[in-house]
Swiss-Prot record:
Active site feature: E192 (proton acceptor)
Protein role: Catalyzes the hydrolysis of phosphoanhydride bonds of nucleoside tri- and di-phosphates.
Gene Ontology MF annotations: apyrase activity; ATP binding; nucleoside diphosphate phosphatase activity
Annotated positions binding ATP: 70-80, 216-226
Gene name tied to this protein: APY2
Topology feature Cytoplasmic, residues: 1-25
Annotated protein name in UniProt: Probable apyrase 2
Segments crossing the lipid bilayer: 26-46
Residues in compartment: Extracellular: 47-467
Subcellular location: Membrane
One Pfam short name: GDA1_CD39
Keyword Phosphoprotein part of the UniProt annotation: no
Membrane topology designation: Single-pass type II membrane protein
Organism lineage string: Eukaryota, Viridiplantae, Streptophyta, Embryophyta, Tracheophyta
Recorded family membership: Belongs to the GDA1/CD39 NTPase family.
Native source organism of the sequence: Oryza sativa subsp. japonica (Rice)
Amino acid sequence: MRRYSALPGGGARPDTLADRLHRYRGVLLVILAPLALVSLVLLLMPRSPASSSAAAGRRWGPLDANKYAVIFDAGSSGSRVHVFRFDANLDLLHIGDQIELFVQKKPGLSEYANNPQEAAKSLVSLLEDAKRVVPVELRGQTPVRVGATAGLRALGAEKSEEILQAVRDLLREKSSFKTQPDWVTVLDGPQEGAYEWVTINYLLGKLGKTYADTVGVVDLGGGSVQMAYAIAEKDAVKAPKPSEGEDSYVKKLFLKGTTYYLYVHSYLHYGLLAARAEILKAGNGKGYSYCTLEGHQGQYKYGNGKFEASASPSGASYSKCRDDVVKALKVDQACTHMKCSFGGIWNGGGGAGQKNLFVASFFFDRAAEAGFVNPKAPVAKVKPSDFEKAAKRACKLNLKDAEAAYPGVQKDNIPYICMDLVYQYTLLVDGFGVGSHQEMTLVKKVPYSNAFVEAAWPLGSAIEVAS
């Protein structure tokens, strides 16, 4: 029965909504109070990261919420495997207690130049390490790439292809990972340099910002050295055309909604180990070297070559060694472009993208071994002049004293510690035009998400294949 309220003058009117709410306010209070309390608790609870299924719905299916990538870095000084785990937004996730799996072994594939099958077998233990951390149900959809760098490039097309084919066969027969023939390849130098640039800027959170906010990267490997930094579009269009057989100077990248024009060049034969051969050849007329330490006798072997490396009767000389290094770098070679680094190569023009410079790989290793950076620190601020000071100290030593002074240096590298440090200083200052007192960041690992990630090109490759 519908209830009515009395109207003025004795008539009746229907109950209004306000009347009914007032009449049942007690019942409403009993119902709404618990609901309000539950809502408040949910609102105040700390937010946890998106669940696997929620993350998966944004990009991949539920089984793919955690996506893995296995990248082999087949360098001239050794082989390394990196395993990365990503979420649906392509952010790195931990693998156990670490942000990545990283395992390395020596020697590199190029040491098996005449035995491709043994070269492939040298990767088996690394492959097993990778399999252990990737869940069985995800292995079939986990890509595995092998990128060989300067060491294999130096062997020539025929020998390097024989080794690569043996590696492809190994992955097809022994691996449960997803693989394709073109995922096992010799990386060209610019691709290696571009991946390295992507890796470091990704880890620093620079991608998506203007080119002036990014950092430049110099990566000194064993067989080659790469310089990469972002330049303005107006400078990119002015880039000289490369000579026949050379790689383009500029790569166009689209990363996190931003277009970058990346100057990148790889200098083959100027990685630390390959440069030793070039320096010894530059001073070869004497029959000895001013760059090797007093007391050393013998030859230096690199690739398929042997180079006279016996020390001068008077021992090493910083200034005379530097002359040989400048000669090896061909600093005075004619420059047909606007600005050149060394060997007549265009240097990209400089600019804001090069001002904040990160230098990696052998730069960090030799600095740590020479004692002017903490070997356990992931990054360190240095100047090229630090390499100069360390070189002058090293060049004064004989072989025996150097072994005592540098306990962290492998015995095979002791005779070349003067040469290596002179080369690194000269490469930076005379080769790349870095000011002697310009501050740089030596980087081995980059802080990321309460962890440290190896500053190497494989992460850039993993980002590409997992995208």
